[in-house]
């Protein structure tokens, strides 16, 4: 994923404002928080059958309680299963089966489509 460098305060404000509009759109239209969206995107981007919660927290730029809450909600909505490691109770594993991965990919596909539509609606 290519990230464009921001050259000045005007570009920064413009990008942050635009990102905030998209975050709002995702929350409103798909009924998920941006932290939940970030967790699902991480899982989609890293095709594994299991993930360590600690790795997800370290990768995302959110505080641990925010990610833990997002993971709990997503687990309750059957986007994945969450369990404690049998050998180390402190370690939380996120397990994704084929059906759950399909559910994640379907949601992210709908979000991507909506972002494309929003690009045509929002004045950049």
Curated annotation (Swiss-Prot):
Cell location: Cytoplasm
Residue numbers binding a divalent metal cation: 7-8, 11
Gene3D superfamilies the UniProt entry points to: Winged helix-like DNA-binding domain superfamily/Winged helix DNA-binding domain
One Pfam family, short name: Staph_reg_Sar_Rot
Effect of residue 18 to A: Reduced binding to the spa promoter. Able to repress spa and aur expression
GO molecular function, one term: DNA-binding transcription factor activity
Main location: cytoplasm
Domain of life the protein comes from: Bacteria
UniProt-reported outcome of changing residue 9 to A: Reduced binding to the spa promoter. Fails to repress spa and aur expression
Gene Ontology CC annotation, any one: cytoplasm
Entry annotated with the keyword NADP: no
Subunit structure: Homodimer.
Function noted in UniProt: Global regulator with both positive and negative effects that controls the expression of several virulence factors and the biofilm formation process in a cell density-dependent manner. Required for transcription of primary transcripts RNAII and RNAIII generated by agr (virulence accessory gene regulator) locus. Negatively regulates the expression of spa (protein A) and aur (metalloprotease aureolysin).
Protein name: Transcriptional regulator SarA
């Amino acid at each position: 994923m290519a990230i464009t460098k921001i050259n000045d305060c005007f570009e920064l404000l413009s990008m942050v404002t635009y990102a905030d509009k998209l975050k709002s759109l995702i929350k409103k239209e798909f009924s998920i928080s941006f932290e939940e969206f970030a967790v699902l995107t991480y899982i989609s981007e890293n095709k594994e059958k299991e993930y360590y919660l600690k790795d997800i927290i370290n990768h995302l730029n959110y505080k641990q309680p925010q990610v833990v809450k997002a993971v709990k909600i997503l687990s309750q909505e059957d986007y994945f299963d969450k369990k404690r490691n049998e050998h180390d109770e402190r370690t939380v594993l996120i397990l994704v089966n084929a059906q759950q991965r399909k559910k994640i990919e379907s949601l992210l596909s709908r979000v991507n489509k909506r972002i494309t539509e929003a690009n045509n609606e929002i004045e950049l």
